[in-house]
């Protein structure tokens, strides 16, 4: 990666989980900081309170506190948080990496929120308008929280290019991740596009 001064700040948006030391987003934040990259993390809010609006406010609070260009890196339910936030916020964003968004419109496995609970908490309907900034949706071929075909259709509605990750489950520790090395490449791709946009406008 290039120097922090030339690159956007990375804002990491977790899904419906608590803090997990072994999660790739946790490890990514540590790695970025070790490389002197500007990074902020929206604190995980667990599943005890599913209020979507509270999570959208948390993204907005962090985004508005960051000066300069911004890239979002979201996972799972965090991807849908970003979609809801993008409908409400005027904060410019240079790009977003949305990794394995879940399909909240279909029943999920036991232990995950029900459709009724998600609707009552403001997650449904899922926003399907094009997002107002460039995005990459990284989708899994065997995600237990959403079929590849339905996530691909959602990504198309958002105006996103789809990155086929192959068989990576839900890209979480239960699926063997851990460190996710490809995140670096995809973040660099989004960040480089942001830098090129700034040069073109100069």
Which stretches of residues belong to each language-model region?
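Conserved hydrolase catalytic core segment
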Residues: 84-95, 104
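Active-site catalytic motif of lipid deacylating hydrolases and related acyltransferases
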Residues: 6-68
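Conserved alpha/beta-hydrolase "acid-adjacent" motif
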Residues: 21, 144-150
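C-terminal catalytic histidine-bearing segment of alpha/beta-hydrolase fold enzymes
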Residues: 160-202
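Short beta-strand/loop motif that positions the catalytic acidic residue
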Residues: 130-139, 143
């Amino acid at each position: 990666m290039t120097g922090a001064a030339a690159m956007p700040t990375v804002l990491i948006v977790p899904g419906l989980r608590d803090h997990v030391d072994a999660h790739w987003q946790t490890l990514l934040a540590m790695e970025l900081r070790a490389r002197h990259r500007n990074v902020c993390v929206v604190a995980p809010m667990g599943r005890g309170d599913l209020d979507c609006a509270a999570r959208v406010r948390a993204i907005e609070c962090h985004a508005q506190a960051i000066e300069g260009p911004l890239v979002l890196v979201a996972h799972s339910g965090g991807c849908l948080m970003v979609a809801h936030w993008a409908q409400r916020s005027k904060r410019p964003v240079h790009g977003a990496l949305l990794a394995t968004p879940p399909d909240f419109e279909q029943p999920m496995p036991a232990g995950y929120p029900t459709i009724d609970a998600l609707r009552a908490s403001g997650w449904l309907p899922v926003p399907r308008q094009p997002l107002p900034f460039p995005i990459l949706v990284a989708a899994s071929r065997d995600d237990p929280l959403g079929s590849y075909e339905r996530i691909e259709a959602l990504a198309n509605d958002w105006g996103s290019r789809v990155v086929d990750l192959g068989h990576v489950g839900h890209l979480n520790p239960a699926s063997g991740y851990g460190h996710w090395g490809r995140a670096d490449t995809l973040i660099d791709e989004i960040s480089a596009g942001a830098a090129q946009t700034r040069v073109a406008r100069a």
